[in-house]
């Protein structure tokens, strides 16, 4: 059943309005009547509600993310099921995605892009220190709140993509996915570093480095093509900034930053 305004989940969360929709879930603004605050409730779409394996993964991911409390992460408060509806309750962040912000501004100044990259890195560092790899870092999954805080959202959801969501989901992400992910191989925190490098490229130039007509064409570019200098678009970019992007986006994970801490200190 569709969730409607005024409906309650677990007699606690009152649905106020739908605020977003992704490949596998809808997101609603809700009122938590126990703690008297507004929250975001993410609900698995009806077409996935019968898929036991999917529901289990949805819950495992939510629980792993729930252990993370960090100012640069959209925090997860609760996870559960009510009348066959699997849901995750999260911090409600008023703001826009980094993708929308880049589209609005065309491209970002070096100082601002660097500040955003540092905040994203700090959120990811907290996750990595807890053994959680995001696997889907992209401007669509980074929120800039109305008070200027930068928060990473949708943790580990990339890990739960089963065959039936790949088609709907991967297209948005393939521009940012690492060569090892494009190959369908093993991915770890070094993949997050790569995706953040691509995100930085887009922040600074307004373009993604690899584009094409199909998912496969773009994936092949991640595997085979050298990244073009961001100075092609913005000639005055500092050399140090360009070097950071190059180091994040090395084809071989071993040649990237060893961890977020090393990247943060360079930024």
Feature names for model-found ranges:
Residues 15-22, 27:
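Protein kinase glycine-rich loop
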Residues 45-67:
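AlphaC helix of the eukaryotic protein kinase fold
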Residues 79:
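Activation-segment/catalytic-loop signature of the eukaryotic protein kinase fold
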Residues 175-267:
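C-terminal lobe helix-coil module of Hanks-type protein kinase domains
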């Amino acid at each position: 059943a569709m969730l409607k305004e005024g409906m309650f989940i677990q007699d606690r969360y009152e649905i106020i309005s739908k605020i977003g929709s992704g490949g596998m879930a809808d997101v609603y603004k809700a009122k938590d009547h126990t703690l008297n605050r507004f929250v975001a409730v993410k609900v698995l779409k009806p077409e996935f509600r019968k898929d036991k394996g999917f529901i289990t993964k949805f819950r495992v991911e939510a629980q792993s993310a729930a252990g993370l409390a960090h100012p640069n992460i959209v925090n997860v408060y609760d996870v559960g099921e009510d009348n066959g509806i699997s849901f995750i309750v999260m911090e409600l962040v008023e703001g826009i995605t980094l993708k929308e912000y880049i589209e609005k501004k065309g491209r970002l100044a070096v100082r601002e892009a660097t500040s955003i990259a540092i905040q994203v890195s700090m959120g990811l560092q907290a996750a990595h220190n807890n053994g959680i790899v995001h696997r889907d870092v992209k401007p669509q999954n980074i929120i800039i709140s109305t008070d200027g805080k930068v928060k990473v959202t949708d943790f580990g959801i990339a890990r739960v993509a089963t065959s039936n969501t790949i088609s709907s989901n991967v297209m948005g992400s393939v521009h940012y996915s690492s060569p090892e992910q494009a190959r369908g191989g093993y991915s770890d925190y070094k993949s997050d570093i790569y995706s953040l490098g691509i995100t930085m490229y887009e922040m600074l130039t307004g373009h993604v480095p690899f584009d094409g007509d199909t998912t496969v064409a773009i994936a092949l570019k991640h595997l085979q093509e050298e990244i073009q200098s961001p100075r092609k678009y913005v000639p005055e970019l500092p050399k140090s900034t360009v070097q950071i992007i190059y180091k994040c986006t090395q084809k071989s994970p071993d040649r990237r930053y060893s961890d977020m801490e090393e990247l943060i200190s360079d930024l």
